[in-house]
UniProtKB/Swiss-Prot annotation:
It comes from the Eukaryota. It is found in: Mitochondrion outer membrane; Cytoplasm; Mitochondrion. It comes from Mus musculus. The modification N6-methyllysine is found at residue 255. This is Sorting and assembly machinery component 50 homolog. It is a multi-pass membrane protein.
Length: 469
């Protein structure tokens, strides 16, 4: 009887019977006789059985939820497409090292003339895995060591221990992750961690020891995360020359907060998008679940990307946020917003805009920042179609402001203060995209609207990170 083998299926064509688009990894062998081929290609088929080879500690219910759509396929192309989608879902669980798909005509006494069997050949991950890699944060690099216990209880649970040593931050943490069967985006996690960070722009050292629990879920076209966090914070001076304003912030505090984040992301890439939009909103309420820190904090991020002629992209972004202390106690330097640097308002030093004391930047309780960008291919297109596609020429205009507000005044007074003393800059440079990990920028910046106390970077400025204004 005719058989069809399809292993590691690549994305399939949206319609038609052009099997040549499947790539090298999909093969068709022994398709005979022609009458059977006609049945498979041009008539309805029925998926009678789905088999799994290679399962060990994985429970049946977690995988049944991922392959249910395969049974709904009505023709061969749809069977292959849905099998490929099921394969991607199985790999996304993070419990298999390899998943291959075999599609064959059905055998046995109950076999229908147009019946098919689909077999998933899987290789489970080992019970304990380790990793070593480097990560790029916002103008910071770090080395990361990790140990992971995948599929701990057989339903895609995961326990992870991670140690990170960076240029400004050292951390280690233990986390437990549990997805909902059949809906990987709906998951629950618990984290224990300790983070020690150095913030030279504020002459501040901070050590956080905490626990958090969060629940993530999709809702229509949005993604939501609800989180509780309890953290013991220890603030200290980074140097003997720290200002008095920083010294009086030193000591211990306990923060217990509830937060919510909503994300709508239609971009084709999070690092250097060519099209799509991002809208992100975060809310945090501290003090009502314990601790000695009380505030309401809100911030948002908006980004729009539009492709233009000649392989160019126009991008615009807007950030903003506000922190309102609750009660008579002022806000902490650890909770305020910071602005400036190669990843936000370019042309200014890292976090060196706004309120400061004796050269130490104290952050602000309200801010906004916006940017206009034009990304074009490199002149004369060197390396076109290859390595040169990772580079883009970059023209930008940034602006923003960071300040403290008098909450006894009305909204008009707040807007007026945020509109005063606007810092802005413009320039041009080159952007390098490092896959989907990070991006590097080398820009020539001309800062404008500089205020007293601001620290500028007039000329060439280098930036590395994953989130840019």
């Amino acid at each position: 009887m005719g058989t069809v083998h399809a292993r590691s299926l690549e994305p399939l064509p949206s319609s038609g019977t052009d099997f040549g688009a499947l790539g090298e990894e999909a093969e068709f062998v022994e398709v005979e006789p022609e009458a059977k081929q006609e049945i498979l290609e041009n008539k309805d088929v029925v998926v009678q059985h789905v088999h799994f080879d290679g399962l060990g500690r994985t429970k049946d219910d977690i995988i049944i939820c991922e392959i249910g759509e395969v049974f709904k396929a009505k023709n061969l192309i749809e069977v292959m497409r849905r099998s490929h989608e099921a394969r991607e879902k199985l790999l996304r669980l993070g419990i298999f090292r390899q998943v291959d798909v075999l599609i064959d005509t059905c055998h046995g006494e109950d076999a229908l003339p147009n019946g098919l069997d689909v077999t998933f050949e899987v290789t489970e991950l080992r019970r304990l895995t380790g990793s070593y890699n480097t990560m790029v944060g916002n103008n910071e690099g770090s080395m990361v060591l990790g140990l992971k216990l995948p599929n701990l209880l057989g339903r895609a649970e995961k326990v992870t221990f991670q140690f990170s040593y960076g240029t400004k931050e050292t951390s280690y943490g233990l986390s437990f992750f549990k997805p909902q069967p059949g809906n990987f985006e709906r998951n629950f996690s618990v984290n224990l961690y300790k983070v020690t960070g150095q913030f030279p722009w504020s002459s501040l050292r901070e050590t956080d020891r905490g626990v958090s629990a969060e629940y993530s879920f999709p809702l229509w076209k949005t993604s939501h995360t609800v989180k509780w966090e309890g953290v013991w914070r220890e603030l200290g001076c980074l140097s003997r020359t720290a200002s008095f304003a920083v010294r009086k912030e030193s000591g211990h505090s306990l923060k217990s907060s509830l937060s919510h984040a909503m994300v709508i992301d239609s971009r084709n890439s999070s690092i250097l998008p060519r099209r799509g939009a991002l809208f992100k909103v975060n809310q945090e309420l501290a003090g009502y679940t314990g601790g000695d820190v009380s505030f309401i904090k809100e911030d948002f991020e908006l980004q729009l990307n539009k492709p233009l002629a000649l392989d160019s992209v126009f991008s615009t972004s807007l950030w903003g946020g506000m922190l309102v202390p609750i009660g008579d106690k002022p806000s902490s330097i650890a909770d305020r917003f910071y602005l400036g640097g190669p990843t936000s308002v370019r042309g200014f030093s890292m976090h060196s805009i706004g309120p400061q004391s004796e050269g130490d930047y104290l952050g602000g309780e309200a801010y906004w920042a916006g940017g206009l960008h034009l990304y074009t291919p490199l002149p004369f297109r060197p390396g076109q179609g290859g390595f040169g596609e990772l580079f883009r020429t970059h023209f930008f205009l940034n602006a923003g402001n960071l300040c403290n507000l008098n909450y006894g005044e009305g909204p008009k007074a707040h807007i007026r203060k945020l509109a005063e003393c606007i810092r802005w800059s413009y320039g041009a440079g080159v952007v390098l995209r490092l896959g989907n990990i990070a991006r590097l920028e080398l820009n020539y910046c001309i800062p404008m609207g500089v205020q007293g106390g601001d620290r500028i970077c007039d000329g060439v400025q280098f930036g590395a990170g994953i989130r840019f204004l």
